[in-house]
Amino acid sequence: MHVPPTDPARSAPPASPHRRRRPKALGLTALAAAMLMAVPTTQAAFGSDVRPAAAQEVVGGGDLGPNVLVFDPSTPDIQGKVDEVFRKQESNQFGTDRYALMFKPGTYNDINAQIGFYTSIAGLGLNPDDTTFNGDVTVDAGWFDGNATQNFWRSAENLALNPVNGTNRWAVSQAAPFRRMHVKGGLNLAPDGYGWASGGYIADSKIDGEVGPYSQQQWYTRDSSVGGWGNGVWNMTFSGVEGAPAQSFPEPPYTTLETTPVSREKPFLYLDGDDYKVFVPAKRTNARGTSWGNGTPEGESLPLDQFYVVKPGATAETINAAVDQGLHLLFTPGVYHVDQPIEIDRANTVALGLGLATIIPDNGVTALKVGDVDGVKVAGLLVDAGPVNSETLVEVGSDGASGDHAANPTSLQDVFVRIGGAGPGKATTSIVVNSNDTIIDHTWVWRADHGEGVGWETNRADYGVHVKGDNVLATGLFVEHFNKYDVQWSGENGKTIFYQNEKAYDAPDQAAIQNGDIKGYAAYKVDDSVTTHEGWGMGSYCYFNVNPDIRQQHGFQAPVKPGVKFHDLLVVSLGGKGQYEHVINDIGDPTSGDTTIPSQVVSFP
């Protein structure tokens, strides 16, 4: 899934598909005892490992557990502690360790925080400029020989950076959001050596200098400000970005919307004096630029004692009891097995994960169910399918939901789904959205193509995302490798701004993917009954490495109606491993050969 950037003078990685090599296994080291000096926060007494029975009152507030490391400028040996986490997590792609590195407001000098798997770094101010690094927050790809295409599951948030050499490096692929950041310099999105990279997502951020994507295949930037944008490979999409390049797809491949129709930034933890709170930003319509650039952002602050602070070992029964009592949910870093769905049926509930908190459904249950109510905010969670097939992993609203939530929509933000990779996993449909007006803001829904428990039937997952509600908006939709439809859209007036897809690598033959008389299931299917739908900046790639003779009829399928519109579509055959015959329906040139050159459609119909 990789080609050189458009300017070979700046970098020249070879053209070749991605994620074909397994990473080298590196031994895990124990965290140094000195790291424990970064003491987890304490507030009201919570802290017992013994969880209350569901019939008992669930207590809100408390400490944030051992995997949230909180620093202030006087903490000794900050660099050493951060480095120790990185050594543990640099190549720990399918491990169970989770960390959140939290920095109290202040100035930190000579810091280079390298961020590995399942690690989140964040400032604890209300605004990014409250917490300043004279230094860098870095993601590179030394662990994988300069290939950044497996730099998944990590995040940076709510910090200001003065990069040491003037440019910060954030060389990531999917599920690695860069939110609410102020880079007082440039931002390099490619690894050292300009190897392959497959990102990515920026939101609510200000980059004073130029952003250099270099070898990045695609990228989505929302409601931000940039000092310039260097290049594009296949698909660079912007909505509500000050300083974004002008609309010019296909050459250069820039898709630019002046504003984002509806957005609401992700909730985040911060310090108000000595008290921990969660800030819940307000919804914005037709947003452009950051939410914080003009001072205090609009939104609501919730004290920590209104949250059940969920720690590893907590049961779904207790989590649900907390919601029933009126508490919000703050998942501390860890892995949580649930034997029944986590159910959020109360309007305006916040469920926020720290450090890529991970939920695994046992015995085929659904991991998370959100009711058809107003304003639920779910953010910062990884749902990892279990070995017994789940019909669904995440549901928003029940089937047939009909409520009007336009004034106060439910949102899924940085909610990631994985089927296989860490071990056997199966799910029929990963995410089902029944509620009207839902916002899906940055998700990576991934049927694993490498790791443990991977095979056409071993990690069977027919459908990625199925949208049934009306007026649903997806901003930054990454869905890959499903056995049938990656995205199916049945609701009216849906919108998608940026879509990245790969079809499943491991189809054994043409018959395995045949969809009636259609060769292969579309990567993005709009049902024939739909009359209004619109999408911008959308790409699908194929790499049928098991059987390169497979033909995919099209990447996109939609009814030909005046209200169904697409802008800036592309399909790519990665190294000639399989081919597309068209881009959308029977429109668009076929891909051919092994040159990894996209076939594009600028507008549909």
Curated annotation (Swiss-Prot):
Signal peptide residues on this chain, from the entry's feature table: 1-44
Consequence when changing residue 198 to A: 13-fold decrease in catalytic efficiency while nearly no effect on substrate affinity
Annotated positions binding substrate: 174, 194-196, 217, 446-449, 480-481, 505
Phenotype when changing residue 174 to N: 280-fold decrease in catalytic efficiency
Thermal characteristics: Optimum temperature is 50 degrees Celsius. Maintains 70% or more of the maximal activity from 35 to 65 degrees Celsius.
MF terms (GO), sorted A to Z: glucan exo-1,3-beta-glucosidase activity
Enzyme Commission number(s) from the entry: 3.2.1.58
Induction info: Is up-regulated during growth on biomass, i.e. when the bacterium is grown on cellobiose, xylan, and various pretreated switchgrass samples.
pH dependence: Optimum pH is 6. Maintains 70% or more of the maximal activity from pH 6.0 to 9.0.
Catalytic machinery residues: 502 (proton donor)
Keyword list, A-Z: Carbohydrate metabolism, Glycosidase, Hydrolase, Polysaccharide degradation, Secreted, Signal
Keyword Signal: yes
Catalytic activity: Successive hydrolysis of beta-D-glucose units from the non-reducing ends of (1->3)-beta-D-glucans, releasing alpha-glucose
Domain of life where this protein originates: Bacteria
Family designation: Belongs to the glycosyl hydrolase 55 family.
Function of the protein: Exo-beta-1,3-glucanase that specifically hydrolyzes laminarin and laminarioligosaccharides, producing glucose and laminaribiose as end products.
Protein name listed in UniProt: Exo-beta-1,3-glucanase
